[in-house]
């Protein structure tokens, strides 16, 4: 891998994102589509931009992302985590600010499995006393 490129892997729920930071003008490409084209929701676009806005590097990098698995929210979170890791690979001094904002820690919440005899993970059939 060349020195002009920084890499970070991000995960959230079942989504995994591979993020490449290259010096550029601020283009964000996700699975060969633009950020606005890939995410319909403004909240998802905002989540992806958060680490860049915090570190004031929005116009400094072109970001290339491949993301698989999960849904819209999980993919946005995975991309944010990947961008955070790539930024720390680029400049370790950004770590404290990113950690304070809560972007460094991987969100470990996963879907709870469905149990036998229950309708969902915790939803039980109606109880009849008599």
UniProtKB/Swiss-Prot annotation:
InterPro entries from the UniProt entry: Ribosomal_Su5_D2-typ_SF, Ribosomal_uS9, Ribosomal_uS9_bac/plastid, Ribosomal_uS9_CS, Ribsml_uS5_D2-typ_fold_subgr
A single GO cellular-component term on record: cytosolic small ribosomal subunit
GO-annotated molecular function: RNA binding; structural constituent of ribosome
One Gene Ontology biological process: translation
Cystine pairings recorded for this chain: none
Pfam families referenced in this protein's UniProt entry, alphabetically: Ribosomal_S9
Gene3D superfamilies per record: 3.30.230.10
Keyword Ribonucleoprotein tagged: yes
Keywords for this protein: Ribonucleoprotein, Ribosomal protein
Protein family membership: Belongs to the universal ribosomal protein uS9 family.
Protein known as: Small ribosomal subunit protein uS9
Species: Pseudomonas fluorescens (strain ATCC BAA-477 / NRRL B-23932 / Pf-5)
Gene name per UniProt: rpsI
